[in-house]
């Protein structure tokens, strides 16, 4: 299942956080995108440094900048189907959600390759 090769410990941020705080978090964690959650930690979408750069100067919080275009899968989903979805989507990763719609992790092409190598060569 997707659970075996997803990356955990993903940086999330509440949709009510300020733009400057989010940029600082991106810089601190060396990422260009944050996963956005609501007060109940349910996934809402993503915010990228590119989105902030384009319109971040006219908003106080990241809420209006959140995009809901990144494909999602759920824990327990079939690994092969997730791999096919990742490749066909053109996105650099898939967001993995738990049944309660909170973030479990992400699947990247690198995490897929590592899992495949582990299966092939142990």
Language-model features: locations:
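Tandem CBS (Bateman) regulatory domains
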Residues: 1-9, 23, 43-91, 99-122
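Eukaryotic tandem repeat interaction scaffolds
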Residues: 7, 11-33, 41
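Thr-Gly-centered strand-to-loop micro-motif
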Residues: 13-14, 37, 73-74
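Short loop/turn microsegments at loop-to-beta-strand junctions
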Residues: 31-34, 91-93
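Core beta-strand residues in small-molecule sensory/regulatory alpha/beta domains
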Residues: 37-38, 97-98
């Amino acid at each position: 299942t997707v659970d075996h090769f997803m990356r955990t410990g993903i940086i999330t941020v509440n949709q009510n956080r300020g733009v400057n705080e989010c940029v600082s978090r991106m810089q601190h964690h060396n990422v260009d995108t944050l996963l956005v959650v609501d007060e109940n930690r349910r996934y809402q979408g993503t915010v990228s440094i590119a989105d902030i750069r384009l319109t971040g100067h006219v908003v106080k919080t990241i809420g209006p900048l959140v995009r809901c275009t990144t494909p999602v899968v759920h824990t327990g989903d079939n690994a092969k189907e997730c791999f096919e979805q990742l490749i066909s989507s053109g996105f650099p990763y898939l967001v993995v959600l738990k049944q309660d719609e909170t973030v479990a992790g992400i699947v990247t092409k690198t995490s897929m390759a590592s899992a495949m190598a582990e299966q092939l060569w142990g």
